[in-house]
């Protein structure tokens, strides 16, 4: 069984002692406790501070004792990478600062952006504290020192990555920085690469505790960093090593789980059978943390209503788009409609009362649809058949579909894996899983001209999806829909053909996991793809009327509050606003 014990109280305690939280300025940290860093310069002290660095992956801003901003801080990225990507609508009802993000109308004074900036630098600050303290712990062995500092550097790179994909240029702040007022002159992938190379070279393969970043998790982050830099040959070397030898921190070799949906099951996550996880945001329930450790970042993304007969306490956010749902259709060969997936639509119950009859879509579908999207008439995990409109906050605003991957099973409530608020649970968020390694490898092989090998990697993922043991079933054991999926059997002959197939596969496999927007930007196709999406989706959702994606929307604005807070005494700005804002 998964080890649900977390060190949350220790981490909060340690962070308060050394004053990790941000006050007026995002890194202007003043001690607020009675113990100094010197008091933490012990083996147990530095481990406690390291645990605090991991704690930030939950998205909750422990530094100020609040869960405020957890939805935009969470590395599930449902706000910045989901509702901006064409995969999802904001959901709930009209209005709010998230609507501006969804419509590509973010302004520098958007408080959600300030939350994300402060959160990323809070995490970076925690990692820097670990590195500074570890250097002065007298009785650490060489192996212990390398393990602690390797984890801290991998985490620092992770926080920087999730800040970079949102804001672009960031200031570099490390353990030796004395003045936090540093310029944001360029993208910091080289600094992240150096941190990750150190982690890859120095971290052990195994740990006794669930959730710690090991050698191969660092390698995976490094490979992704190299892909972002288009260092294809270097990335291939790392990716090939991961595929050949990569193991989780229990020493079990990475491989795809036999059943796709087991990635999103509490009873599988963290066990020896969990061979696909590379890095999870570790969540727990009923651990005396006032629900802080239970995935606050996705706490809004449940069916609306909060009744005992449905999961969650609220709130109907992050609703899959019709465009995404249509992408799961398959043709007579069991392949996706890559170039015209919106030519025909998956049937939905828009405007149909839950008490009225409804016939589900009868065409062939990729089976991953019903592990990704909640739709009328299909079992919603073990909560019974999705009733449609009764669980939707406002169909007219955001449509008839609901998220599924972030939702716990009803059985999890009876096994104490759900917190009393019913909006948080022990269901981890997969930050990085082995399927993404295969997709990154496919991308690299395409860039290097190895189309056949790229197709092999993509087909591994499609073969797993085709496993009938992983299909959603009706109570009588029959498939819940007409599932039909096949592998690619005709060779890809051009780079464009291979790219198009690989990118479509990545959308389907990782749908609603917060990656797509950043991939579209990285591939240089965001403007074309997202404006095409808006032209289609606005015919379904009037709230998108007038929205458009412009060149500068590839990154978000630097929060004005941070620009103001980091001015020099003479009024000179150290942070520059991104172009177009």
Question: Predicted regions span which residues?
Answer:
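Short acidic-aromatic linear motifs embedded in glycine-rich loops, typified by GG[WY][YF]DAGD(H)
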Residues: 23-151, 155-166, 171, 176-177, ...
């Amino acid at each position: 069984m998964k080890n649900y014990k977390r060190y949350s109280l220790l981490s909060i305690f340690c962070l308060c002692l050394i004053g990790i939280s941000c006050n007026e300025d995002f890194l202007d940290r003043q001690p607020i406790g009675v113990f100094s860093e010197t008091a933490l310069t012990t083996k147990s002290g530095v481990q406690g501070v390291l645990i605090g660095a991991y704690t930030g992956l939950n998205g909750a801003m422990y530094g100020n004792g609040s869960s405020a901003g957890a939805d935009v801080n969470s590395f599930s990225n449902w706000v910045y990478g989901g509702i901006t990507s064409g995969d999802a609508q904001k959901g709930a009802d009209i209005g709010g600062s998230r609507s501006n993000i969804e419509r590509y109308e973010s302004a520098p004074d958007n408080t959600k952006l300030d939350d994300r900036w402060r959160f990323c630098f809070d995490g970076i600050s925690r990692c820097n504290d670990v590195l500074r303290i570890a250097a002065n712990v007298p009785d650490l062995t060489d192996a212990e020192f390398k393990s602690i500092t390797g984890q801290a550097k991998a985490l620092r790179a992770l926080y920087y990555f999730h800040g970079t994909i949102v804001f672009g240029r960031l200031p570099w702040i490390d353990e030796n920085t004395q003045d936090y007022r540093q310029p944001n002159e360029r993208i910091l992938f080289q600094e992240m690469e150096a941190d990750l190379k150190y982690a890859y070279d120095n971290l052990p393969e195994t740990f006794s505790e669930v959730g710690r970043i090991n050698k191969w998790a660092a390698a995976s982050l490094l490979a992704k960093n190299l892909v972002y830099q288009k260092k294809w040959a270097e990335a291939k070397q790392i990716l090939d090593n991961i595929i050949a030898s990569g193991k989780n921190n229990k020493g079990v070799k990475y491989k795809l789980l036999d059943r796709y949906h087991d990635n999103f099951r509490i009873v599988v996550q963290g066990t020896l059978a969990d061979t696909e996880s590379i890095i999870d945001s570790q969540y727990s329930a009923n651990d005396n943390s006032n629900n802080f450790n239970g995935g606050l970042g996705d706490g809004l993304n449940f069916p609306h209503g909060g009744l005992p007969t449905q999961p969650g306490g609220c709130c109907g956010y992050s609703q899959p788009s019709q465009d995404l749902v249509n992408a799961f259709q398959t043709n007579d060969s069991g392949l996706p409609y890559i170039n015209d997936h919106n030519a025909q639509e998956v049937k939905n119950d828009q405007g149909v009362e839950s008490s009225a009859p409804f016939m589900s879509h009868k065409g062939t579908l990729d089976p991953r649809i019903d592990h990704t999207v909640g739709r009328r008439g299909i079992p919603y995990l073990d909560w019974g058949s999705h009733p449609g409109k009764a669980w939707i906050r406002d169909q007219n605003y955001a449509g008839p579909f609901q998220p599924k991957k972030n939702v716990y099973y009803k059985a999890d409530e009876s096994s104490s894996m759900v917190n009393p608020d019913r909006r948080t649970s022990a269901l981890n968020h997969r930050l990085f899983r082995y399927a993404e390694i295969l997709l990154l490898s496919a991308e690299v092989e395409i860039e290097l001209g190895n189309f056949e090998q790229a197709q092999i990697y993509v087909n591994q993922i499609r073969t797993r999806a085709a496993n009938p043991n992983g299909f959603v079933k009706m109570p009588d054991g029959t498939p819940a829909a007409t599932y039909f999926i096949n592998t690619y059997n005709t060779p890809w002959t051009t780079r464009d053909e291979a790219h198009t197939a690989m990118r479509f596969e990545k959308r389907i496999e990782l749908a609603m996991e917060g990656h797509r927007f950043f991939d579209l930007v990285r591939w240089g196709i965001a403007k074309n793809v997202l404006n095409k999406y808006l032209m289609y989706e606005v015919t379904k959702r009037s709230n998108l009327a007038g929205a458009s994606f412009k060149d500068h929307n590839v990154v978000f604005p630097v929060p004005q509050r941070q620009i103001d807070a980091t001015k020099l005494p003479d009024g000179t700005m150290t942070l520059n606003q991104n172009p177009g804002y």
